[in-house]
Amino acid sequence: MEYFNVGKIVNTQGLQGEMRVLSVSDFAEERFKKGSQLALFDDKDRFVQEVTIVSHRKQKHFDIIKLKDMYHINAIEKYKGYTLKVSKDNQGDLQEGEFYYHQIIGMAVYEKDRLIGYVKEILQPGANDVWVVKRQGKRDLLLPYIPPVVLNVDVPNKRVDVELMEGLDDED
């Protein structure tokens, strides 16, 4: 079965079995909602077990979750550093123009017909996502995911068309 990373357990939260998760999910509210089925992978990326979310809340930059049958700090401390993943079957359907992060990572980024680089990471600093574009011989380009910049995302052809606003690329 194919799995996709949605978060990393970075610490415990309190004594009642809550976990502090650093989310890398494109749909965190949906992914961590009560009843969601996820898979737990250890620090060597080996499958450990299926888990079910019983509660979720946001706190600062973290998602605080509690898993079924894990109700005390002693039961969850060993999972620090583990990864939560969603199976391909549990991803859900997307609306027109929506896509998953794993579909964007690795896409070629073009301005007109000039290859700029490849999306290597997606950051979530605030109001909009920022795509980190790996370029050859240059520093990474931070590309805001906003309509004036990202013109088209062609998932089947793994291509992103952009128009770089003045000042966005400080190496040109």
UniProtKB/Swiss-Prot annotation:
GO molecular function list: ribosome binding
Assigned keywords, A-Z: Chaperone, Cytoplasm, Ribosome biogenesis, rRNA processing
Gene3D superfamilies from the UniProt entry: PRC-barrel domain (2.30.30.240), RimM (2.40.30.60)
Localization annotation: Cytoplasm
Pfam families in the record: PRC, RimM
One GO term of the biological process aspect: rRNA processing
InterPro entries in the record: PRC-brl_dom, PRC_barrel-like_sf, RimM, RimM_N, RimM_N_sf, Transl_B-barrel_sf
Major place of residence: cytoplasm
All residue ranges annotated as the PRC barrel domain in the record: 96-168
GO cellular component: cytoplasm; ribosome
Tagged with keyword Coiled coil: no
Assembly behavior: Binds ribosomal protein uS19.
Task performed by this protein: An accessory protein needed during the final step in the assembly of 30S ribosomal subunit, possibly for assembly of the head region. Essential for efficient processing of 16S rRNA. May be needed both before and after RbfA during the maturation of 16S rRNA. It has affinity for free ribosomal 30S subunits but not for 70S ribosomes.
Family the entry assigns: Belongs to the RimM family.
Domain notes: The PRC barrel domain binds ribosomal protein uS19.
Record-given protein name: Ribosome maturation factor RimM
Organism: Streptococcus pyogenes serotype M3 (strain ATCC BAA-595 / MGAS315)
Lineage of the organism: Bacteria, Bacillati, Bacillota, Bacilli, Lactobacillales
